Design a protein with these regions (language model features):
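Coiled-coil/CHCH-like alpha-helical segments characteristic
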Residues: 1-193
Length: 193
């Protein structure tokens, strides 16, 4: 009986250690995604405020800063690299900068909706001034469910957060706080792709 009890205790300890390690790895993925998104946002801000390219001083060490961060899962890394590379190309080419800035403007609405979807799916509060949009989004999601249609842009919260991170744009202070709350909630919930 004592041997069986020790075995169960040891097994429980190993399972707890493995679970803690898995949570730590998941947290590292979310932290890396957040860091890469912030780095991309820095470049987006430079595109928005840039005079004439090139912005060599501002982008110096980009590869080094990026490479100091651990890699994301391959599909995620590709999407974030695409955002980073598009911003760097816009910083190096004036014609590309105008197109990229226009893309950021067009993506503002999409980013706002994704952030609202994330708050809704994670049960987080939205700012009071966004309650009308949140209600409209809830109605839209209910309508989709009742029509039994595929949910375009739906999917797990992690995938929606990746979509938000991969979309060019600059979050204001309020949206940055909201995004950080989303990252924290996903990390806490242990949601992965």
């Amino acid at each position: 009986r004592a041997v069986e009890s020790r075995f169960r205790s040891a097994k429980a300890a190993v399972e707890a250690a493995l679970a803690a390690r898995a949570r730590s790895r998941e947290a590292a993925v979310w932290n890396t995604l957040a860091a890469k998104e912030r780095l991309c946002e820095e470049f987006d801000a430079l595109v928005r405020t840039a005079g004439d390219p090139p912005q060599d001083a501002a982008t110096a060490g980009t590869d080094e800063r990026w490479s100091t961060l651990p890699p994301l899962p391959p599909a995620w890394e590709q999407r974030m690299l695409a955002r980073r590379d598009a911003a760097l190309h816009a910083l190096a080419d004036h014609a590309a900068a105008a197109g990229y800035a226009s893309r950021m403007e067009r993506g503002m609405e999409s980013r706002a909706e994704i952030l609202l979807e994330l708050e809704l799916s994670l049960g987080l509060e939205s700012p009071a001034e966004l309650h009308a949009q949140r209600l409209a989004l809830q109605v839209k999601q209910l309508r989709r469910r009742f029509q039994d249609a595929a949910t375009p842009g739906g999917g797990p919260a992690g995938e929606r957060l990746l979509a938000w991170c991969a979309e060019p744009g600059i979050a204001d202070a309020r949206d940055r706080r909201r995004c950080e709350r989303v990252f924290a909630a996903i990390e806490k919930a242990g949601r992965t792709t």
